[in-house]
Each structure stands twice: as structure tokens, then as C-alpha cells.
């Protein structure tokens, strides 16, 4: 039985704990403990799931753990992840993998050195609509991809305290586009600004234009300005086009003669992601989202930020 823990139980960390708790019913996973600096929150959630509470995450290292989810603010990812990795414990780190390229490289190097599974929580790769679109792309149903256009907009949230819209929102679509293009970004240009939230140092609007090594172009619009939340991706190919709605998990494909709504078995992407991580640790498989994938997405996001600042 795989013994797991979660460090950081804010909104996203709570969902990691909830899903591990659900997976316990299959008998393959045991949620050993939770850790958070907020003791009231920690005690509340630990009591809900009937597991040990650790106010200091380092105390979890004394437990017989196989894997851990790291769901803390991005600037703490390296600090929290490395002690677990060095002890041979596999790690699922929420996106982005780290706050800097240097820290991401250090996490990846330690994971390789200690032969542990490292996966990054780019959860949209596990969205059933994205996986179905990937099938159509690989079968050539859209022909050669020419452009991909994503929109990820919505109101301001208090959930994210340490990142603007590029590192928090756009990084999702940066990764999905790389996944669908099966290529790395070659050039990136971005415009970004803070429109409505002057007390926040991070950008609340960004427009990113990228070119991949295989000549596919990508356009991403993200903001925390729009009252209505939208999460969409459109693809133009030489044989057809595709419209994807991330939230509704809908996918529609068109060519000159037909319109097709893809049949999709709708599932919670995060549950698919965590179940996949568990399977990779149990069976020593390479995860769908590797540390290198996380690094590539982070690099593109950071270069977009630099571009938006005129660098």
C-alpha cells in the first residue's frame, strides 16, 4: 500500500487530501498525514479525514512515506520538496514547478539523483477534453496545426498570493499547447500590465504570443478582470478546426463538410492526475507530466514575463 502525505492544505491542498482519501477506498493508498502552518486549518482538515496533523512538515520525514503532494506557495517549492526527494520519497509538485529556473533545475537534478518519481501538477493535461483533442491531433484529423488560441479569464481571487496571471494562469495553457504541439517554444513575446489591482505588484492581464520549434503559433490571453470565468482553447489546422471548453469538458471539431461533437467521459482532472501519479510511483512509470515538462512551461512563462517588461 502506497503511503502518502500532503504539505499545504489551502484550497488546492485540501483537494489533494480529499482525493487521496477517496483513493483509500480502493485499498492501494493510505493517507498518512497532513501538514500546514495554519494550525486551526490543519486540525480541522486532519480531523475530517482522520489522519495525523503535522504543523512542521519536516516531521513527516519520520513517517514511512512513499510519496507526497507539495501544495505550498511557489516560492517554497524547492525548500519543501528537497528534503522529501533526498529521502527517496516521490513528489507531486503543484504548478509551476518552482519560482525560478535555477530552483526548478535543482529539484529535477535531485529527483534524478535519488531515483524518485517527480511530477508537476499541470492538471489540464488530465482534462478528458484535452486528452480527446490530443487523440484527434495525433490521428491527423485536423491536419497540420497552424495556430492555437487560448483564453483563461475571470475575476480576481484571494487564493493566489504569490503569482500574477502569467505564472498562475497562462502556465496552464503554455503546457497544454506544448503537449498538443509535441514541441518546445522557440520564441515568446508578451504584453502584461496591472489594470485594476494597484495594491498587487503582479500583473492582472497578459497577452502572450509564442512560436514553437515545429512552426506552430500560440496565442494566450489571461486576466483577473473578467466577471465571468472562461477557459477555452481553439485550434486551427490545415484540415479542420477545434473548439475546446476546459470547464464543461466539451470538444467540437469542424471541417468543410462536417461538425462533430466529441464523445467525452467527463471526469475530475485532478483525480485523474493524482491517480496517475499513484500508479507511476507504484509501478515505476514515467509520469505524463515530468519535471522537464514543468521546467519547459516555467521557462516559457518567465521569458514571457521578461518580454512584457521590455527584456
From Swiss-Prot:
Name by which UniProt lists this protein: UDP-N-acetylglucosamine 3-dehydrogenase
Organism annotation: Methanococcus maripaludis (strain DSM 14266 / JCM 13030 / NBRC 101832 / S2 / LL)
Disulfide bond sites: none
Record has Metal-binding as a keyword: no
Keyword tags: NAD, Oxidoreductase
InterPro entries registered for this protein in UniProt: Gfo/Idh/MocA-like_OxRdtase_N, Gfo/Idh/MocA_Oxidoreductases, GFO_IDH_MocA-like_dom, NAD(P)-bd_dom_sf, UDP-GlcNAc_3-dehydrogenase
Entry EC number(s): 1.1.1.374
Catalytic activity line of the entry: UDP-N-acetyl-alpha-D-glucosamine + NAD(+) = UDP-2-acetamido-3-dehydro-2-deoxy-alpha-D-glucopyranose + NADH + H(+)
First-level EC class: oxidoreductase
SUPFAM superfamilies in alphabetical order: Glyceraldehyde-3-phosphate dehydrogenase-like, C-terminal domain, NAD(P)-binding Rossmann-fold domains
Keyword Heme: no
Pfam families tied to this protein: GFO_IDH_MocA, GFO_IDH_MocA_C3
Entry similarity comment: Belongs to the Gfo/Idh/MocA family.
Entry function: Catalyzes the NAD(+)-dependent oxidation of UDP-GlcNAc. Highly specific for UDP-GlcNAc, does not catalyze the oxidation of the substrate analogs UDP-Glc, UDP-GalNAc, N-acetylglucosamine and glucosamine.
Assembly and interaction partners: Homooctamer.
